[in-house]
Amino acid sequence: MNKQQLKAYFMLMRLHRPIPILLILWPTLTALVLASHGLPDISYLVIFTIGVVVMRTVGCIINDIADVDFDKHVARTNTRPLTSGQLSIKNAIWLCISLTLVAFICVLFLNLYTILLSFVALFLAILYPFCKRFFAIPQLILGLAFNFGIFMAFSTIQNQIPVEAWIFYIATICWTIAYDTIYALADREFDLEIGIKSSAVLFGNKVFRYILLFNFLSLLLLIILGIYCDFNSFFYLGVVICSLFFVRNYFLYKKLGITNCINAFSANHWIGLIIFIIAVIQYI
């Protein structure tokens, strides 16, 4: 394997773009903190971090395999390794299988409940790339998939999925729909041309209102989570800071353009970090 092929595999796994990994990792780590009522065992932090990174790459590979013919028509994606012919579909499938096995080995260190949930997580990861063909809001499926680690974190620590896990899960789904709609704005013109469905297409000229709506719902659910868990004022201060980030992002993505939308999308990882920090503060 030469240097060019290694670079192609690196690009296929999106390791050069770590922001989506952080968008998955922060809610997962936050869930571990919430479930543990403090800092969790280091082994869980390691297992879940590896799991997030590996399953994110698996999702990217499945996505590129599913979209190989569509990506040729989109300026942002027509140079991807599979679309450009740097790697074959066969190469991608073998890498996907190998990484899935790595993720499954990690899960084997956890309890039976979490092992069973991992199959649901895999199903969602496979489903998302294909639902863009028939489901009007694929961002909802992405939200279910990206944040499923929340359930797995609670099942690992508590062997159950309590009410607070559901509240946090739904909050992060709303957040995901919002930030991935921003991301989809970058490709909306191309998606309309080739018939790909997205929330950015569905919401049309009201898209900015819907993004703000889902941001508001995520904040509201975080407040409900804070009340349910009897969190202190630092938690609500963090929620206020998150709302300021949402406002800042609004003025960025409202300008449209690929760069503005991608930058607004990427800034959401700071929101995930803030939520993680204020969750940790609750148990110090």
Curated annotation (Swiss-Prot):
Keyword Transmembrane applies: yes
One Pfam family here: UbiA
Manganese as UniProt keyword: no
CDD domains registered for this protein in UniProt: PT_UbiA_COQ2 (cd13959)
Membrane topology (UniProt): Multi-pass membrane protein
Pathway info: Cofactor biosynthesis; ubiquinone biosynthesis
Keywords: Cell inner membrane, Cell membrane, Magnesium, Membrane, Transferase, Transmembrane, Transmembrane helix, Ubiquinone biosynthesis
Family: Belongs to the UbiA prenyltransferase family.
Entry protein name: 4-hydroxybenzoate octaprenyltransferase
UniProt gene name: ubiA
